[in-house]
A protein has these predicted regions:
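Class I S-adenosyl-L-methionine
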Residues: 243-275
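A short acidic, Gly/Pro-enriched loop at the edge of an enzyme's catalytic core
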Residues: 195-204
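Conserved beta-strand signature within the Rossmann-like core of class I S-adenosyl-L-methionine
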Residues: 234-241
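Class I SAM-dependent methyltransferase core
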Residues: 63-65
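Glycine-rich SAM-binding Motif I of class I
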Residues: 71-75
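Rossmann-like AdoMet
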Residues: 1-61, 78-112
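S-adenosyl-L-methionine
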Residues: 106-121, 125-138, 152-196
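A short glycine-rich, Lys/Arg-flanked "PGG" loop and its adjoining helix->strand segment in the class I
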Residues: 220-233
Length: 275
């Protein structure tokens, strides 16, 4: 086996991640791939942005993901687009796409309704992990809305079989718009983040690159400043990385940054809002 081909591993919530020898890191938290993505990107990012959304009906929310990876963030976002009946134009850049023989083994069971809490402190299942997105969407918000209450508290139902949906995401053509449903348009970008122009007029950014230790070139202040110029005022950026220097670089680049509680295994994460 090539030393650069990622290896499948099961995480504590039962969902799969990959370990990459190239960078010596996992694609997701080993405490739970689904619960990490649901908490940081769906809850603190997409659902928060949708709550603030005041654009006319039919206007697309433009999301940019740094690191397509396993496609889990895209899958959750597609599912949320169908649930909310909001059009999402989803851009995702990836320099090292995973091979077909590997992504065909991925499976995320996301089709059942979601309980709002996990009793007894047990490690949540994939379905229960998504409930953290309900809670995360309320973190750091103003007003008296009760934690756990949400416009998304109804059962989410099926997008379609989650495995076939994931395969459609991976098999979609690169470097062009691909309409996957009435509410979800995917545009995968093949290449290096430092060498390509960013999409314009962004409303939401999932900054999910490997760590600053593994990919320091993707955490430079100059890159954040370029990204800020491509964001609309009020755009939200979320990332698992809560390092102080990353926070300061984002702030100097034109974002207001807050630390928020992270998913299991992660004390804090960052959410930045374009000033």
């Amino acid at each position: 086996m090539s030393q650069t081909i990622p290896q499948l591993e099961e995480t504590e919530d039962g969902s799969l991640t990959l370990y990459t020898p190239r960078f010596g890191e996992h694609y997701h938290s080993t405490h739970g791939a689904v619960q990490e993505s649901a908490h940081i990107y769906l809850g603190l990012g997409l659902r928060q942005r949708l709550e603030q959304w005041t654009e006319p009906e039919g206007a697309a929310l433009r999301c940019f993901e740094v690191g397509f990876g396993t496609g889990l963030n895209a899958l959750l976002s597609w599912r949320e687009a169908e649930r909310s009946h909001r059009l999402i134009h989803y851009y995702s850049i990836e320099r090292y796409p995973i091979p077909a023989e590997l992504y065909r083994q991925l499976h995320y069971e996301l089709s059942t309704a979601i309980p709002l809490s996990t009793a007894g402190g047990a490690v949540p299942s994939c379905e229960e992990a998504l409930a953290s997105a309900e809670l995360a969407a309320n973190l750091g918000t103003q007003g008296t809305k009760e934690v756990g209450s949400s416009t998304s508290s109804a059962p989410l139902g099926r997008l379609e079989d989650s495995h076939s949906a994931l395969m459609r995401l991976h098999e979609a053509a690169w470097d062009e718009d691909v309409t996957l449903s009435r509410y979800f348009v995917l545009h995968k970008i093949s290449g290096d983040l430092n060498a390509l122009p960013f999409p314009a007029a962004l409303d939401l950014v999932y900054y999910d690159a490997f760590s600053p230790e593994s990919q320091p070139e993707l955490w430079r202040e100059e890159l954040f400043a370029q990204l800020r110029r491509c964001c609309r005022p009020g755009a939200i950026l979320t990332t698992y990385c809560a390092k102080g220097e990353v926070r300061r670089r984002l702030e100097r680049s034109g974002f207001s940054v807050e630390r928020l509680p992270g998913p299991p295994g992660k004390r804090e994460v960052l959410r930045a809002t374009a000033r």
